[in-house]
C-alpha cells in the first residue's frame, strides 16, 4: 500500500528526539528552586537592608504638574485655538479685515525639549492670530431684550469691531459709511456736523433721542433700519468726537464701541443727495432746515445758475466800494464773502484766482488815482474826515502847539497856504531837538489825510519820488544833511510850485506839480547858510520842548484821527476850504451819482 501523501519515513533519524523528550526524575518544589537560585559565588550582591523614602514625592508632584499642564493645553487648543482656521486652509488664514498685532504672551506652550521653552512667556508669536467667532444662538440674558443682546454679543465676539459695524451698516443702508463721511483721526478736532452710526439701540431710547437732541442741534436726520441707527447732527456749537460720544452714550444707554462717528462730506454731491432723498422718505425723521452744504448741492435756484459764471467787474466794484487796494486784502476779504456772494463762490472755484486778484487791485488803483486827481483839496479832506469814526476835540492840537510855543494864528495861516499849494509856501518844516513830538504830530496829520511817507534811504533809486503822484500830501521824516543837499540840488523847482518831470516805474515820466510836502528835522535850515536858497521856499516851526507824558506812560495830548477831524470841522472856514454841500450838487441842482464800474446795468433786477 502506498505511503500517505506528504509523509516520508526516514528510519534512524528520530532517535535524538526520543532521547531529548525523556523527563527528568528531579522534582523540586518552588521553595527549593528559589533557594538554589539564591546561591551565588558573588558576595553582597543583594542589599537586604531597610529602604528610605527618598525623592519619590517630588517625582510624583512633577508628574502630576506635567499631566495637568497637558490637559490644560488640550482644553485651550479645543476652545480657543487661533490656528483652527490655519489648519483648515492656508488661504483662509491670510484673510483679515484689519491688521492684527503680534501677541506679547504665548497662549500655547511649545513642546519642551529640556530647554525650558515653556517658561518664556514674553516671546513673540510670529504666526498671525485669527479669531473665529462662534455665532451660535445661545440663550439670552434675563436683563434685556433678546434681539439687542444677540446683536451686542455678535459685536463683542468679532475680532474687528469697526469692520463689523461698517459691514452691518452697509447691509442696512446699502451704502458704505466711508462714502458719507471724511476721516478725522484726532478725537480733539471740533466740528459742527457729525454722522453717527449706532448699533443695537433700544426702541424707546431711539424715539426719545429725536426730542432730546433738538436742544443741542439746529438740524437732525435720524433713521433706523434693523439693529443699525443712523444720525446726521448739525450742532449749534462745535464739538469733538469725545464730547459727542459722551452725549450719545448717556442718551441711548450704549457703549462707545457701538458707535461710529465721523464728520460728513461737505463737497460731495452724491452724499448730499443721500441725505436729501433720505429725509424726504417716511422712514426718516428730520428736524430743522437743511444745512447750507446740502441745500447748495441739491436745491436748485437762481443762486446756483449765477454761481457757475464769474463776473470780474462785480469783484472790482466790490473792492472799489470797500476801499480794498492791497492784493492780499482783496483776496482774503473776498474769500470771506463766499458764503453770501455767489460771484465770490465762482471766483473760489476758478483756476485763475491769483490773476484776478492782481488785475482787480490794479483796476482799483487806476480808478482811485484818477478820482483823487479830480478832487480838490477841500473835497479830499472832506472825504477823508467823513471816514473817521468817533468824536474828538480840536483843542488837543491847539494846546500842543501852545505847549511848544507856536503862534497858532501864524500856524493856521501857514497851514492854509500849505493845503492850497501856494507856490513857495507849500512846504512846512517842523524842527527841534529829539523827543519833542515832531514825528508824532506830522504822522498824525499824514494818517488822517491818507498821505504818503518818503524815505531818503531809497534816494539812490530814480523812482523814490514816485509816491508824490499817488497822493495829496507827503512827508519826509527826519531830514538830515544829505537830504537837505539833495533838495537844494534837485527839488528847488518843485518847491517853487512849477511843473516837474516825475519818473515812474513801468511808465513814461509824467508832468506834475509838487503837492504839499511836510518835513521834520533836527536841523533848522533857516540857520544854515549852505542852504540859503531853501529859506524862502520852506516855512519853519520849532518844537523846543519834550513831548509830555502822563504817569501811565500815555501821551498828555491826544493827536488822533478824531482830533484832526474836529480840528478841520471847527476851522473849515478859517482854512478857506470850499463848502462841500454845494459841490455835491450839480449845475442844475442834481446830486452826483456814485461811481459804477460793474458791467451790470443800474436798472437791472436784483
Curated annotation (Swiss-Prot):
Positions of region (Disordered): 581-606
EC category name: isomerase
Key word Nucleotide-binding present: yes
UniProt short sequence motif Nuclear localization signal, positions renumbered to this chain: 76-78
Residues modified to Phosphoserine: 81, 89
Family: Belongs to the papillomaviridae E1 protein family.
Protein name, UniProt field: Replication protein E1
Organism expressing this protein natively: Human papillomavirus type RTRX7
Lineage, top ranks: Viruses, Monodnaviria, Shotokuvirae, Cossaviricota, Papovaviricetes
